[in-house]
Amino acid sequence: HLNLGWNELSDEGAKVLANSPTLSQLRTLILDSNHIGDSGSLSLANSKNLANLKNLNMADNNFKSDGESALLDLRTRNLVDKLGEDKGLNLNVLYLRNKDLKALSLYQKMEEVLSLSLRENLFNHQGLGELAASSFVKNIKSLNLMDNSIGDKGVFLLSESESMSQLEVLNLENTELTSTGILALAQSPYLKNLQELNLNGNSIDRKGFLFLS
């Protein structure tokens, strides 16, 4: 864990960090408010010394969309490339936002993932929609969305996703779900392989549970 937030590193400082082999085991790097522009962000994104980085805070810097995209690609590669032999990907409590899920949806290596856990992050139905629409998630059999504010809209997008047709286990505990979302699940043409469904901690009334009967 290295916190260098609120300093004046600029692009040159970012390049020094990117070229430092001593950071090869670093998992969390905080560089918010450091006047880092596109060249500095691209140096970090292309660094081979940050292969183990899981959390990167670059808020309030000066890079534009290309730099942001490159940094998202770095984080995505680092997260997914650590996929274990069981093909399970644990991305719990990593402060993932909608843009992070979009980056995941564009990464072809996601085709290898069989189990994906996204518990307690910061995305909503929009981020989930990006992921669910990706052809690269078609092999996922277990999906944990516990403690995310996806609501009925998120469940509807999930229910309408052909890429989710292999799902056997779905955890929707504490996801702000109501009976409207349950109806979407029950009527989904794609979620026919579900064997285990966790709906604990939601606002589902009697009518909602009847939809599942």
Task: Describe the residue ranges of each PLM region.
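LRR N-terminal entry segment and analogous cap-like coil->beta motifs
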Residues: L83-L128, I140, M146
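Leucine-rich repeat
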Residues: D11-N19, D38-N46, S65-V80, R97-L106, ...
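Inter-repeat linker/turn residues at the boundaries of leucine-rich repeats
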Residues: P21-S24, K48-A51, G84, L89, ...
